[in-house]
Amino acid sequence: MLVYPEDVDRRLTWPLGKAKRLARQHKLPHILLPDGSIRFESSEVEALIVRVPQHFAGELSRP
């Protein structure tokens, strides 16, 4: 499934426009449509997300 750059920004909690900029710099895998617009494959975006196990997340919040 293809997703918009704005959806990637929201999913990764990035400022709007960051995914599009990274794609244009060839630093993020993307698909360039015939009209020049950029889309991302949702499975590739999900692969960028690192899941932190809950027991580690609890340790990170301790002073």
Predicted regions mapped to residue ranges:
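Glycine-centered, phosphate/nucleic-acid-interacting loop/turn motifs that mediate DNA/RNA or nucleotide
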Residues: 26
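Short amphipathic alpha-helical segments
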Residues: 4-5, 38-40
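Short Lys/Arg-enriched helix C-cap and helix-to-coil transition segments
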Residues: 31-38
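Polyanion-binding surface elements
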Residues: 1-22, 51
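Structural signal for short hydrophobic segments within the conserved structured cores
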Residues: 1, 29-31
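A short, Lys/Arg-enriched interface patch at domain edges and termini
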Residues: 43-63
